[in-house]
Amino acid sequence: MPQIDIHPEWYNDSKVYCDGKHIMTIGSTKPELHVDIWSGNHPFFTGSQRIIDTEGRVERFMRKYNVQKTADT
């Protein structure tokens, strides 16, 4: 026999807040959700993230250990 009333209450209009601002409305088991980061302020999604490593790994190794490049034979 299945158990009755074991599922959490579902809220179709749960509000999501970030920094005190209402961001979106979703379905959830909690009436309000407070998040620190979302796609609207994350550097990856906003395009403000920069790739710092422009030099390859092999070149860094060669420079670090002062290895001279030689011609392949």
Swiss-Prot record:
<dbReference type="GO" id="GO:0005840">
    <property type="term" value="C:ribosome"/>
</dbReference>
<dbReference type="GO" id="GO:1990904">
    <property type="term" value="C:ribonucleoprotein complex"/>
</dbReference>
<dbReference type="InterPro" id="IPR002150">
    <property type="entry name" value="Ribosomal_bL31"/>
</dbReference>
<dbReference type="GO" id="GO:0006412">
    <property type="term" value="P:translation"/>
</dbReference>
<dbReference type="GO" id="GO:0009507">
    <property type="term" value="C:chloroplast"/>
</dbReference>
<comment type="subunit">
    <text>Part of the 50S ribosomal subunit.</text>
</comment>
<keyword id="KW-0150">Chloroplast</keyword>
<keyword id="KW-0687">Ribonucleoprotein</keyword>
<dbReference type="InterPro" id="IPR027491">
    <property type="entry name" value="Ribosomal_bL31_A"/>
</dbReference>
<keyword id="KW-0689">Ribosomal protein</keyword>
<comment type="similarity">
    <text>Belongs to the bacterial ribosomal protein bL31 family. Type A subfamily.</text>
</comment>
<keyword id="KW-0934">Plastid</keyword>
<keyword id="KW-0699">rRNA-binding</keyword>
<protein>
    <recommendedName>
        <fullName>Large ribosomal subunit protein bL31c</fullName>
    </recommendedName>
</protein>
<dbReference type="GO" id="GO:0019843">
    <property type="term" value="F:rRNA binding"/>
</dbReference>
<keyword id="KW-0694">RNA-binding</keyword>
<dbReference type="Pfam" id="PF01197">
    <property type="entry name" value="Ribosomal_L31"/>
</dbReference>
<dbReference type="GO" id="GO:0003735">
    <property type="term" value="F:structural constituent of ribosome"/>
</dbReference>
<dbReference type="InterPro" id="IPR042105">
    <property type="entry name" value="Ribosomal_bL31_sf"/>
</dbReference>
<dbReference type="InterPro" id="IPR034704">
    <property type="entry name" value="Ribosomal_bL28/bL31-like_sf"/>
</dbReference>
<comment type="function">
    <text>Binds the 23S rRNA.</text>
</comment>
